[in-house]
Amino acid sequence: MKKKLVSVLFAVMVLIVSIPKYSFAAESGKVIFINMNRTTIKSMQDIPSLKAELEKRGYMGLMNIRGDKGTDDKRSLASMGAGGRANLASDSYINFKEATKENATIYKSSTGKTPKKINDLSINQSLNENEANGQYGSTLGSLGQTLSDNNFKVAVLGNSDTVENGELKENRNICLIAMDNYGRVADGNIEDINIEDDTMPFGIRADYDKLTKETKSLYENNDALFVDLGDTYRLDQYKGFLNEHTYSKMKKTIHNNISKYLESVFNMVGDNDVVYIASSFPSKLAYKNKERLSPIIKFKGNEKGLLSSSTTRRDGIVANIDVGVDILNEFGLENKSMVGRAYSLIQKDDNVDFLSYELEKMATISNKINSCKYFCRSCICILGYRYGSYII
């Protein structure tokens, strides 16, 4: 009898131990993060399918976009993936490529690591820069590394490539949020996703038919997918070459293309999946006007409201360093080196109006502080204490 009992207990223990962590993915659902860079809250309302979805559900927040030793698009994305303010090498040393026989050899010889499908061939430059000159001790690629270590599959899709002096200027910074500690992403497409279109900024745009098809394929074969809708970034960079009429025309076309794409995403995802839509950095005009918090939306379940986190302790105000932590939390994971905090979801029906008002109010206060900071120390102390860490 004892032998039978021991045998049964042993068999149960073997079954429990043998269940891989990945087997819980179906329960936790999948994650899609969509970067709609250089987009404002107001512009998001101009995208029909997104506006319709927000009328029904979605939690919104305004996101601090600061990095380490500077504030820009790439540092914001890297800070999301690091879970702390991150520093990077200059643009010329960020070099994500899909693996070939030649560049895979170069990558391995410089890092000593086995390349994956997508690799930053110059990752040591950013790792060394962040370690030597970073002020916050953040670890690049913490999000991607933690997912990989726990057998969750990660993919990236899209780019924000532009044209400079007649030559293609690569921008595959979406990889900075998804990569592991060595600048690698296991799956995706960052190169063959755009088509020529002379009616669009820089004469190129995303191929939305291919983007939709590959989103579905990568979604089915991975647990976390990070998508860069580069057309919004390209439009903001190209704005100086346009007048009011041509800018509005291009913007409307881009928004309609994005609307169809997002509609396909909303129809594709399951009930347990989570979709994030964010602008990793404000538009140039918004930044100039002191609107230095970017919108982020989390679609989870059927309720609507505000995002909050203990990083900022203000309803509706979050930080880029919270993004990676919240994504890990959706998979039941954590990384103690990441200092951001997972979101709290606060019910509020008028979330869009509330955040639009908050953003306008903070921009006004920021302008007031900057206009009198050399003359009114009490203004800085009072207003800066309440809002300064978010907007100045």
For each feature predicted by the language model, list its residue ranges:
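Residue-level detector of intrinsically disordered, flexible termini
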Residues: 10, 24-25
